[in-house]
């Protein structure tokens, strides 16, 4: 007995002690994890181009019951020289993972910390030590009844065109697109402690996060060497737009668990329904001019200017000019440094920029 005259141990604990019983709650919520991966690829090349195709499938069954992941993916890489001065290429990637994940209430940790003298029982709502009920210590076997699924789709593509019309002159344009969508579905049944404690009588949730980003880059560069003089000039532009759509819906109170998260609007607790959305579009535009000059790999001059604009800033403050200048002296290339053995590289550089 304890100081108040009550029993420290409950009767079931005395029985387990007398019968030398030891109950493994962890075994009740775990299994042997299995993972399988399959891949198929094709590739080829010629003097004018090359290609690569791959397809993959993977399936994982986690150590905790109901924990799993199925994934499909595909990839295409290709580049081709249409003419000696014209080259095109593309890269396409698709992934589609689908996951069944257990509730955030910590199935594994609760089972690992369960009372080893408490008989494994899926019908009790909480795990107890002694005769004390702990409403925070949910039965992990019942927690496995929570449906918590996630589906993702992602498609990304990058394409380019490269032109070399004259010696030293390069013109390049590239366009990339990245689309991502994630759906999360969760249903907490009405007859488990997580629902009973918070008077949910069943709760259904659905969230969707969708994003699309596109970027278009263009550049013209000229690179030539005239005796000891080397020049490089670049002009480039970049435009990016990001669109994000986010929606969510939650319902509480269901007469049956039969419909899971498929009919959120059927909840009878209408004052506890929740729905919301968020739509955001952001754009970024950049212009870059750069000129490099060096003489005999000794003396260097560089001038750069960026002109950037972003829709995230207030009107009247969306554009900014950022110039920079630098000069360098490669002292190690001077004749008076040839005989010394202390330095193999010594350069002095000064720069200024915003």
What are these regions (language model features)?
Residues 44-46, 57, 80, 92, ...:
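Residue-level signature of outer-membrane beta-barrel architecture
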Residues 41-43, 54, 77, 158-160, ...:
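Outer-membrane beta-barrel architecture
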Residues 35, 39, 60, 284-287, ...:
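Conserved interaction-surface patches within small, structured recognition/assembly domains
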Residues 29, 37-59, 63, 75-81, ...:
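Predominantly transmembrane beta-strands of Gram-negative outer membrane beta-barrel pores used
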Residues 1-21, 32, 62-156, 172-285, ...:
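Surface-exposed loop/interface segments of Gram-negative outer-membrane beta-barrel transport/assembly proteins
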Residues 51, 287-305:
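Short, contiguous hydrophobic alpha-helices characteristic of membrane insertion segments
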Residues 55-61, 301-313, 350:
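Transmembrane beta-strand segments that form the barrel wall of outer-membrane beta-barrel proteins
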Residues 315-319:
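Short glycine/threonine-rich loop-to-helix capping motif typified by GTGT followed
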């Amino acid at each position: 007995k304890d100081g108040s005259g009550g029993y420290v141990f409950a009767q079931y604990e005395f029985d387990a002690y007398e019968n030398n019983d030891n109950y493994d709650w962890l075994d009740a919520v775990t299994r042997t994890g299995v993972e399988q991966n399959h891949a198929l690829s094709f590739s080829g090349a010629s003097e004018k181009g090359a290609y690569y195709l791959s397809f993959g499938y993977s399936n994982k069954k986690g150590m905790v019951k109901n924990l799993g992941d199925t994934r499909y993916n595909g990839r295409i890489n290709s580049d081709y020289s249409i003419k000696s001065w014209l080259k095109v290429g593309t890269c396409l990637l698709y992934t589609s993972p689908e996951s069944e994940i257990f509730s955030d209430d910590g199935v594994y940790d609760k089972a690992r910390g369960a009372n080893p003298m408490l008989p494994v029982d899926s019908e009790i709502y909480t795990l107890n030590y002694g005769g004390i009920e702990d409403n925070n210590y949910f039965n992990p076997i019942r927690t496995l009844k929570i449906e918590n699924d996630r589906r993702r789709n992602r498609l990304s593509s990058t394409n380019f065109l490269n032109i070399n019309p004259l010696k030293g002159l390069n013109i390049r344009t590239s366009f990339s697109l990245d689309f991502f969508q994630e759906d999360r579905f969760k249903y907490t049944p009405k007859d488990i402690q997580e629902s009973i404690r918070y008077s949910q009588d069943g709760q259904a949730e659905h969230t969707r996060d969708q994003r699309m980003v596109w970027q278009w880059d263009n550049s013209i560069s000229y690179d030539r060497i005239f005796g000891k003089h080397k020049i490089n000039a670049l002009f480039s532009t970049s435009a990016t737009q990001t669109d994000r759509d986010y929606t969510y819906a939650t319902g509480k109170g269901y007469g049956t668990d039969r419909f899971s998260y498929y009919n959120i609007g059927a909840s009878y607790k209408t004052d506890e329904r929740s729905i919301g959305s968020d739509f955001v579009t952001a754009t970024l535009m950049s212009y870059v001019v750069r000129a490099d000059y060096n003489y005999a790999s000794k003396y260097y001059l560089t001038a750069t200017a960026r002109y950037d604009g972003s829709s995230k800033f207030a009107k009247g403050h969306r554009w900014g000019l950022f110039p920079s200048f630098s000069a360098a002296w490669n002292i190690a290339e001077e004749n008076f440094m040839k005989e010394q053995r202390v330095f193999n590289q010594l350069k002095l550089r000064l720069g200024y920029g915003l």
